[in-house]
Amino acid sequence: DAFKCVIEWLTGDRAAYTDRTSNIAIKADWSNGNVAMTGRSYGGTTDFAVASTGVKGLKTIVPVAGIASWYEYTNSQGIATGGVAYSDNLAFYCAGRYINTGLYQNDTEWDPIKETYPAYLNRIYNDQIALNGDYGTHWATRDYTAGNEGKAGTASTSTYNNFNCPALIVHGLNDTNVRTKQFQLMYNSFKNAGQNVKLILHQGQHITPDYDSHKTSLLIDGESYNGILNKWFSHYLYNQNNGAENMAAVTVQNNTDGSWTTLSDWDGNTETLRLACGDDGKTTVNSNYSYADYGHFLDNTDSTAARAIYTMDVDTDTVIVGTTKVHVKATPIQHLTQQAAVASDENTRAVAPRGVNHEEAMNSLKRANNDDSDIAVMSADSGSRDALMMSAMLIDMSDTPFSTEALDDWGYFIEEETGAVNWVGSGAEDYAVIKYQQTETNYKVIAQGWMDLANPGAGFDSDSASAVKKVELQDGKYYDYTLYLQPTHYTVKAGHKLALVLFTYDPNMASYSENYGYTFQNAETYAEIPVNSFYTLNYSAGANGTVTADKENGAQMEANSLVTLTATADSGYDFSGWTVNGEAVEGGATKTFTINGNTTITANFTVHHSSSGGGSSSGSSTTVSASKSDNGSVSIDKTSASKGSTVTVTVKAKDGYKLDKLTITDAKGKTVDVTDKGNGKYTFTMPEGKVTVTPTFVADNGSQTENKSYSDVKTGDWYADAVKYVSDKGLMSGTGSDKFAPSATTTRAMLMTVLARC
C-alpha cells in the first residue's frame, strides 16, 4: 500500500505533508501524472503487486526477476521447496527497526508495536506450518495474480480484472532463486487482462541485464537494456511515438550460442513431443539415498532404486518452449510404522502454537534455537502421511560434450568481459559488456518440477494445491498426477537425447529422515513436451529492386519467430507488394513476418508512374491491391499486372461470415467486371491503371433464420416486411419458436444486440 499511496500522490489523488506534525501539504507539481515502476527481485515483486491494485496513473511496469505469487517462491504443487515457513523470515528482514534495535531506541513509532510484532511473525509462521506446503488463505493474501480479490483473503479465481497497464517482463531462464514460473504467471495476468505485455528472457540467473552494482551489461540482441527501458518509458510516460509498444511479444536468448530470437507469442508452440516411460510393467523409486548419491543421478542412463530414467533420440534441432507436463499414475509407499513416533510427537506439540524467537533464529550463532523442522505427517490417527515429494527433471544428454555455462564455487555463472563497453554518460562509470564463460558437459538440466504425493489434484495454478483438496493417501491405491516443470525456452541439438528422470525428493529442496517411495505404471507415465520446429527462410527481390532483412537468407528459424524485411525500389520503380509462398500479402515496404513453415518471401516492384502526363505506356504493369477486412481475407495471384492480363482473386471468409460482394475498381473508380469461378475464386481482366479489390463480408446465420414465419405476423400487417427483413438477416429471432411479439417494447439491450449483429 505504501507504493500505491506514493503513486496516488504523484497523480494528485492523495495528500502528502512535509512532516508528521506541521500539517503543511506538499504537491508533486513537477509530476505529469504518468508513473512507471521497475526493480529486480523484491523490487520487481512490488511492481507487480501495485499493478494488481489497478491504481490510477500507473502507466506501465518493468518487473525484473519478480515474484507474482509468494506461494510459488517456496512451494510447488502442494509441497514446500525451501522450508515450510518463510514469510515470517522475510517479514523479519524487512523490519529495519526490529533488526537494528539499537538505532531506534525511544522511537515513538516503534515502541508501541515492538512487543506485538514478534507475535505477528509467530502467527504467520504458524499459518505456514499448518498449511505444510499447501495453498490457503495465508498464501492467497500474498498471491498478486488474484488482484484485490486475493488480498481479500480468498483463493485466486484467475479473474485478472485489476491489471490495467502494459508490462515489459524481464527474467533469467537460469534463475533458480525466483523460478521461471513467476514470469509465466505475470505474463498470463496481463495477457488475460487484455494488456500489452512483452517478455525479455535472457540466459542469465537472478540479474538485471544492465547490472549497476557490477557495472556490467548483458546486451539484448545488440542493444543495451537501459536503452530499451528509455524507449519503453519515453513512450508510456511521455507519449513518444517511437514504436516501443510494437516490440516483439517475446525476445529470448538462445542457450546454444547466445544469439537472440523474437517470437510472436510465448504460448504459440506448434507441436508436442511425447516422451514415454515404457509400454507395460511398473517401476518403483524410493528415497533411500543421500545428497552425495543425488550428485551422481545423471552419470548414466541406467535406472536405479532411487531414480527412473527414460530417454528419446532427438533427430533434428528442436526448441522446447513453455511448460512440460509429466503425467504419472502412481501409488505411494509410505512406511507408516516408521512414522508413528514422529506423528505422536507432532500431536503433542500441536497442543500449543509453535513459535520461533526470530531475533535468535536470525542470529547465525543461535540457529540451534530455531524450531523450524519440516513436517512430513498429517496426524497419528489419519493413517496417512503428508508432504511426500515427487520430483521430475527433463535433461539434455549427449555422448559428445557440448557447451554450457561454467559455474563458480558458489553456483553462479562466471562472467567474461567481451572488451566492448556500454557507455553510460554524465561522468558515470561505463558498463563492461559481458558474456558467460562456457564449459563442456554431457548433460544439462532443462527443467524441473516438484509436487506432493498427497495432492494429486494440484495443477499449474497455485490455488489448485489448496489444503482442502489434499487426500489421505492409501498404499496400493493409484492416483493420477501431473507435474508441471518450470517454463523454459531451450534448444536441443540434433543427435542429443531427451531424458526424463523421476525420483522422490530433491535434496536441494527438502530432506527426509524416513524412507518412502512410490510405484508408477509405466504405460500411463509420460512427458508432454511443448516444442517448436525449425523452418527455412528464403527471401528475394523481384526485378528492379532489392530487399534486406534482420535474418540471413536461408536461415533456420524457430516456429513463431519473426523476421523484418525492407524492400527498396530502383530508380524509376515503386514497391508494389509482397508475395509469401506464391500468395500476395498486404504490407508496406518494411514488414515483419511470422514464420510458421518453410517460407519464401518476394518483394515486387512496378514502373513508377508520374501523377501528371500521358498515362502508362503500352505493356507496362500497374498495381493490384486489396482492401483489408476484419471478417475475411483476400489473396491475389499477382500484385502487379499489365492491361489485358487475367488476375485471380481468392476470397476466404472467417468462421461465421460469408462474402456478400466483391467489388473491383480501376484508377478512375469505375467498377471492373468479375467472374465467379467457384470455390472462392474470382477472375477479372486487368484494365489500364491501378486496381483495388474490396471484399464485403456479412454474418452467415445459415438457414435457420431464412424465410422464417411467425404465427403472430400476417402477410398483410404493416410491419410484415420489416419483420421478414430483420429475421432473414439474423438481426432478430422473435420470442419463441413461432412468435415474434411485434407489439412488445424494444429495450436498450435488444437494440444493442441488433447493432452487434449488424
Predicted stretch roles:
Residues 562-589, 646-682:
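Surface-exposed interfaces of beta-sheet-rich extracellular modules
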Residues 718-729, 736-758:
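Short, solvent-exposed alpha-helical surface patches in non-cytosolic proteins
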Residues 535-539, 589-610, 619-626, 676-702, ...:
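Conserved "repeat-terminator" motif of extracellular CCP/Sushi domains
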Residues 169-171, 175:
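Short beta-strand/loop motif that positions the catalytic acidic residue
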